Swiss-Prot record:
Species annotation: Sulfurimonas denitrificans (strain ATCC 33889 / DSM 1251) (Thiomicrospira denitrificans (strain ATCC 33889 / DSM 1251))
Name the UniProt record assigns to this protein: Imidazole glycerol phosphate synthase subunit HisH
Gene Ontology cellular component annotations, sorted alphabetically: cytoplasm
Function: IGPS catalyzes the conversion of PRFAR and glutamine to IGP, AICAR and glutamate. The HisH subunit catalyzes the hydrolysis of glutamine to glutamate and ammonia as part of the synthesis of IGP and AICAR. The resulting ammonia molecule is channeled to the active site of HisF.
InterPro entries for the chain: Class_I_gatase-like, GATASE, Imidazole-glycPsynth_HisH
Gene Ontology molecular function: any one: lyase activity
Segments forming domain Glutamine amidotransferase type-1: 1-207
Gene Ontology biological process terms, A to Z: L-histidine biosynthetic process
Gene: hisH
EC number(s) from the headed UniProt entry: 4.3.2.10, 3.5.1.2
Spans through the membrane: none
Pathway: Amino-acid biosynthesis; L-histidine biosynthesis; L-histidine from 5-phospho-alpha-D-ribose 1-diphosphate: step 5/9
Keyword Amino-acid biosynthesis: yes
Active site: 79 (nucleophile), 185, 187
Predominant localisation class: cytoplasm
Amino acid sequence: MIAIVDYNMGNLASVQNAFAKIGTQTVIEGDPKKFKEYDKLILPGVGAFGDAMEHLRERGMIEAIKEFAASTKPILGICLGMQLLFESSEEFGEHEGLGLIKGKVVAFDTSKFEETLKVPHMGWNRMFTKEHPLFEGLDEEHYLYFVHSYHALCDDEKDSIGRTFYGYEFTSAVAHDNIMGIQPHPEKSHDNGLKILENFTKYRNLK
């Protein structure tokens, strides 16, 4: 069974509905003591990094998520949820993240943008992916739906499994062992997004 983490900052119903479209039952779970009962966790998120970490902290979820990760069960972060997997973010100050993937989250460097580009990065864009179980059955290059003003920088480029170009190339999907994340919204990305969610439901950690 897959749990969608409810920390009062996310598009929980739309994520759950997306899983329902592929025939997968999920539970919206707000009790961190129950996380260990599930096979997989989804960490969604919409909003500011610092607020999200505070919500997780208030609910006692930070250690529960870290313990789940240490058990080698799969975790998928979506949009802000992916960013929370990193060590820190510079969004509205410096904020500590979950530290499950080494690296940080930074603002788009608009000095590298053409005049026509704006922040946030919003709309359909291509993701170029490495071979990974999340992308099985998808082309190496496929369109997904993005809404974000900050992006991840991986300390280890091996953790970057998806790249997208918006003014410059940035990491749009990550994976380190059982920890995975995607910056775009699969629940808004039609068939390509549903395929990623389906692949996550089938994912089996190798450890």
